[in-house]
Amino acid sequence: MSDSNKKTCNDAKQPILVLDLVRLVLERLSFVDFHRARCVSSVWYSASKSCIGGTNPTAPWIILFPNEHVKTNNDSCKSIDPRDHSSYTIRDLGFDMVRSRCLASSGSWFLMLDHKTDFHLLNLFTRERIPLPSLESIDGLQMKFVRTGDCGFEMSMYYKAHGLISYGKNSDLRISDAVLWVDEKNGDYFVVWFHHSTFAYHKKGGDNNSWKVFQPSKHQGCINMVFKEGKLYVLNPARNISVFDFSGGHSPVEYATPPSPNDDYYVRNLAVTLSGEVLIISSNPKKCFVKLYKIDPKSSEWRLIKSIGDEALILDLGITVAAKDGVMRNCIYFSHHELLRYKGVSLCNDDKYGICIYHIKTKKKVQEFEHLTTSSPILFKDARWFFPTFGGN
């Protein structure tokens, strides 16, 4: 190369050109290949951060959590794209997935409770982990936890009628329900969990690094809850729904809705539609039936419905989404029944729904995943539907 040619070559621009080329390659990859490729080197990882994110799947995926009785890498799990049945083993998470429980999800973020009873937010694709306040850090007198060892704790509850009651040592905190919301564009998050008549919540940028406690006015407990657009919807054992508005930034404001059908014992879930309507869902894992109710705007009473139109219900997320780009119309996406999940029962054949897509009008399964529960021993303890996302898209 001549001296003149050497002078026209600007070495300072070479890293930029490399990033541009890598970015062009990344933007043409599928979601799975995209996340594999971004781990090739620091250059590829840097380029992936500036990708617009056209690789995000438009239909929900299934995430599978490994069973402790199966020989596997403790820090891995498996995801499945149901449209083509392609699977992806997510390895080297740096987190003990076997001895941890997933409580909720938002995009690619998962609320995890580990074997030491510590809460974490875990992004399965970026491997990013955010530790949440410990159980001891609870702002309020209603609930108190004291560590008694590496995994154990002692819990005390304060009741107005009975005063302080201690429940002794425990090593297994059974969170009956939880919700998670994450804004992947700016990193904001909001977490709520319920245990023993008390709700605890925490959000990024709060006043302190602790869980704030609140209780519904009627202390009726919780069997399911959903968080959407700043509001927490709580279904209690009496089949009534309370709504807590967190948009004010301070203590939540409570609202009430008409009582749900109290003649239906199997009401276990609620959901919020795209238009903001509240649905309640009745189902039984031992029997093949599903009922959906919503409030009649004229009578303000709950009525049975047989269609949700051009939407699909993702039961794990408690929301409906538009039925397009691979999402099946007028269907419910089932995974692992919450009663079995709460009791720690692994995926099994006794669940008549199991992991499936169920058509509301025909009352038939339009897609099943029996191979995930027919192996012996069962390979997975839990499954959830989720929407993989990266970069806030």
Curated annotation (Swiss-Prot):
Entry coiled-coil feature ranges: none
Record domain F-box: where: 12-59
Region forming the signal peptide: none
Assigned GO CC terms: cytoplasm; nucleolus
Keyword Nucleus attributed: yes
Localization in the cell: Cytoplasm; Nucleus, Nucleolus
Chief location of this protein within or outside the cell: cytoplasm
Keywords assigned by UniProt, alphabetized: Brassinosteroid signaling pathway, Cytoplasm, Nucleus, Ubl conjugation pathway
Description of the deletion phenotype: Abolished brassinosteroid (BR)-induced ASK7/BIN2/SK21 degradation, and BR-insensitivity. Suppression of the constitutive BR-response phenotype in the dominant mutant bzr1-1D, and accumulation of phosphorylated BZR1.
Superkingdom per UniProt: Eukaryota
GO BP, sorted A to Z: brassinosteroid mediated signaling pathway; positive regulation of brassinosteroid mediated signaling pathway; ubiquitin-dependent protein catabolic process
PANTHER family in alphabetical order: F-BOX PROTEIN KIB2-RELATED (PTHR44259:SF15), OS07G0183000 PROTEIN-RELATED (PTHR44259)
Function noted in UniProt: Component of SCF(ASK-cullin-F-box) E3 ubiquitin ligase complexes, which may mediate the ubiquitination and subsequent proteasomal degradation of target proteins. Required for brassinosteroid (BR) signal transduction. Mediates ASK7/BIN2/SK21 inactivation both by competing with substrate binding (e.g. BZR1) and by promoting its ubiquitination and subsequent proteasomal degradation.
Protein name: F-box protein KIB4
Organism listed in the record: Arabidopsis thaliana
